[in-house]
């Protein structure tokens, strides 16, 4: 019986959305967005992250000004309880995603490990 891999992926999507970790992340994100100060700080933090990632991906040097802004914004978000909670929930979801990725990659790892013998 052939397996539709995309159906499995959609089932995984639904399953992830039902995990306690995702539901907690969703609640934490809602709380940040309901607080104007936290929302503004979090958006600024994400903007700085994107700027740094874009510079890294294009091989641009990250200048002192960008580093200083990143440090300033990081300090601000670390002082905001709602954002800290959100980041903790993001870390829990990241762990799950990494575990799932490891499982998904197992067939390829097994294939290449067998062919190396």
Curated annotation (Swiss-Prot):
Record InterPro entries: Com_YlbF, YheA/YmcA-like_dom_sf
Top-level division of the source organism's lineage: Bacteria
Record Gene3D superfamilies: YheA/YmcA-like
UniProt xrefs under Pfam families: Com_YlbF
Membrane spanning residue stretches: none
Family assignment from sequence similarity: Belongs to the UPF0342 family.
NCBIfam families for this protein: PRK13676.1-2
The protein's name: UPF0342 protein lwe2240
Species for this entry: Listeria welshimeri serovar 6b (strain ATCC 35897 / DSM 20650 / CCUG 15529 / CIP 8149 / NCTC 11857 / SLCC 5334 / V8)
């Amino acid at each position: 019986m052939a397996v539709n891999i995309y159906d499995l992926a959609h089932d995984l999507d639904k399953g992830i959305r039902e995990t306690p970790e995702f539901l907690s992340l969703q609640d934490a994100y809602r709380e940040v967005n309901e607080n104007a100060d936290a929302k503004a700080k979090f958006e600024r933090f994400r903007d700085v992250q994107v700027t740094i990632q874009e510079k890294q991906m294009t091989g641009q040097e990250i200048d002192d000004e960008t580093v200083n802004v990143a440090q300033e914004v990081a300090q601000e978000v670390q002082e905001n309880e709602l954002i800290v909670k959100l980041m903790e929930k993001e870390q829990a979801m990241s762990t799950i995603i990494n575990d799932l990725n490891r499982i998904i990659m197992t067939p390829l790892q097994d294939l290449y490990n067998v062919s190396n013998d």
